């Protein structure tokens, strides 16, 4: 068995990645969501989404390409970029601009209250990005986005997307920094 990382394993070089059960569940829900909205989650799109959902950190396009090549030796950058474009357009993933990387959207298929987020009109997200460990966490604070969208509309601006990226240190990295500081004292 060849391992891509601790969360994704390959049975052989010609097989698709085997994802953990929670990722498989999200992939199945994404496939249903796509079908209900007249879209098709192809096998390549599903694999790229699965790789993104399996990673604890935002995934860059070339990192995704390298992982995809483990199962599809002939995968090329356009293959990954087309899949990423589709996943972005459907709102299943977000692009974190400052990292030039991608994360799964926690609202599109996981909000837990049956919302049709395609009806929102403006895809909105807020991210906390840790400069220590590189992890990104999507916030579920619609009130932040609503205030910004209302302010934009008040001046005649029609928003199409709204993403806020806040960089800092997560709780784990803050504890590590404090421990390192106390060791040096």
Which sequence ranges carry the predicted segments?
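Non-DNA-binding regulatory cores of transcription-related proteins
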Residues: 88-90, 94-185
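A short acidic, leucine-rich amphipathic alpha-helix
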Residues: 63-69, 80
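Short capping segments at the starts of secondary-structure elements
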Residues: 55-60
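Short coil turns linking two alpha-helices in DNA-binding domains
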Residues: 76-77
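Basic amphipathic alpha-helical segments that dock to polyanions
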Residues: 80-90
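Short helix-coil-helix linker/hinge
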Residues: 41-44
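Pre-recognition alpha-helix immediately N-terminal to the DNA-recognition helix
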Residues: 46-51
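Short, Lys/Arg-enriched N-terminal segment that forms or immediately precedes the first helix
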Residues: 25-37
């Amino acid at each position: 068995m060849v391992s891509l990382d601790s969360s994704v394993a390959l049975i052989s070089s010609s097989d698709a990645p085997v994802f953990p059960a929670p990722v498989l569940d999200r992939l199945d829900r994404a496939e249903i969501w796509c079908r209900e909205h007249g879209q098709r989650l192809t096998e390549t799109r599903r694999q790229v989404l699965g790789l993104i959902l399996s990673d604890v950190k935002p995934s860059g396009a070339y990192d995704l390409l390298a992982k995809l090549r483990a199962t599809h030796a002939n995968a090329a950058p356009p293959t990954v970029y087309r899949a990423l474009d589709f996943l972005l357009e459907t709102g299943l993933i977000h692009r974190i601009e400052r990292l030039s990387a991608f994360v799964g959207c926690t609202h599109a298929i996981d909000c837990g209250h049956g919302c049709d987020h395609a009806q929102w009109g403006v895809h909105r997200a807020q991210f906390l990005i840790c400069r220590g460990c590189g992890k990104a966490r999507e916030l579920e604070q619609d009130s932040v986005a609503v205030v910004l969208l209302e302010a934009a509309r008040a001046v005649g601006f029609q928003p199409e997307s709204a993403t806020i990226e806040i960089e800092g240190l997560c709780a784990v990295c803050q504890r590590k920094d404090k421990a390192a500081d106390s060791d040096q004292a």
